[in-house]
């Protein structure tokens, strides 16, 4: 048959089209995770969103995704208390002046920074040799200067760590040997619940070490917490030297070893290696001796450290546990093996 008859004219126009709103909707930028609200490192659309002394907004147009609040600084930046706030740091801004930014925080943000920002290492404005990990716009920073996997894990665990300068030292009289440190950092107390104090110091101080040692101390801290240990008295970490009568570097030369002299519980009980140690194997006569024996075995059994040397090892260790991360090792000391005893001067004995 024939096609349907033409109905005539097209349907009447229902009216004029909606007015053009002009430009497309403004880009709201990355989603704001709600970190640092109204504070340094927080999102902002203008200076009014940064309601603190000297607060200004670095906007999206200037390359800061979602905007970020900042403040001029000469050396230090203020910090805000609360779970929503990160620690700040003073870096050199684009104008060559000091500018407060947020430090990376992997405990609050999966990538350590807000979306659109990267965690990178930068020097302090007045002291460029003092570095820290801060959040800067991804588009404005180059790759390769962020935290390595170990340092990122340390930050994610909540350890108080800051990057440290690389070392390139030689043991005295041994220019053929070089001390290098893997991902050097400073670790501050508590770790995670115990303060670390050098034996001659009146108060805890940050320790220079390789990053893997910081992770090991975190694991040890969880074990020490079971006994209520709040302070660890140590006898040193980094020392660029070779082992005695050897061409091998000590693990102290790699900052992957630490010597423990004593452990102090919250009730004031002191477990001193020098005064309370009895033996690595067999029955002990005192509670303190039993605890020291148990913690030595726990560090070994849990593989917190690869080597644990106690006073049973030799006379050099009469007053401390030496623990380190020697690759491929798993040593504590075996029962039934006669251990060397002190028969001369300490200088005659091998050292760890």
Label each PLM-derived region with a short phrase:
Residues 150, 176-177, 182-188, 221, ...:
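Catalytic cores and adjacent binding grooves of peptidoglycan-active enzymes
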């Amino acid at each position: 048959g024939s096609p349907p008859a033409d109905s005539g004219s097209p349907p009447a126009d229902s009216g004029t089209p909606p007015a053009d709103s002009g430009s497309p909707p403004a880009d709201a930028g990355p989603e704001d995770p709600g970190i640092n609200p109204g504070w340094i490192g927080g999102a902002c659309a203008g200076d009014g969103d940064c309601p603190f002394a000297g607060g200004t907004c670095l906007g999206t147009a200037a390359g800061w995704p979602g905007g970020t609040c900042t403040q001029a600084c000469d050396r230090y930046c203020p910090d805000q208390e609360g779970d929503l706030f990160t620690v700040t740091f003073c870096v050199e801004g684009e104008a060559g002046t000091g500018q407060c930014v947020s430090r990376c925080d992997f405990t609050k943000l999966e990538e350590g920074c807000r979306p659109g920002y990267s965690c990178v290492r930068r020097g302090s404005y007045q002291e460029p040799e003092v570095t820290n990990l801060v959040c800067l716009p991804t588009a404005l920073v180059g790759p390769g200067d962020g935290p390595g996997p170990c340092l990122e894990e340390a930050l994610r665990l909540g350890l108080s760590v800051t990057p440290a300068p690389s070392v390139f030292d030689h043991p005295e009289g041994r220019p053929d040997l070089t001390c290098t440190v893997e991902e050097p950092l400073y670790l501050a107390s508590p770790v995670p619940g115990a303060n670390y104090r050098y034996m001659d110091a009146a108060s805890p101080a940050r320790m220079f070490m390789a990053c893997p040692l910081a992770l090991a101390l975190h694991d040890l801290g969880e074990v020490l917490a079971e006994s209520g240990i709040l302070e660890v008295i140590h006898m040193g970490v980094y020392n660029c030297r070779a082992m005695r009568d050897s061409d091998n570097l000590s693990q102290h030369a790699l900052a992957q070893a630490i010597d423990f002299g004593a452990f102090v519980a919250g009730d004031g009980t002191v477990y001193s290696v020098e005064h309370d140690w009895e033996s690595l194997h067999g029955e002990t006569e005192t509670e303190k001796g039993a605890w020291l024996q148990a913690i030595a075995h726990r560090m070994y059994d849990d593989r917190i450290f690869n080597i644990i040397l106690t006073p049973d090892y030799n006379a050099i260790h009469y007053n401390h546990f030496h623990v380190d991360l020697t690759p491929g090792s798993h040593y504590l000391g075996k029962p039934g093996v006669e251990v060397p005893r002190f028969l001369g001067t300490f200088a005659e004995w091998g050292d760890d």
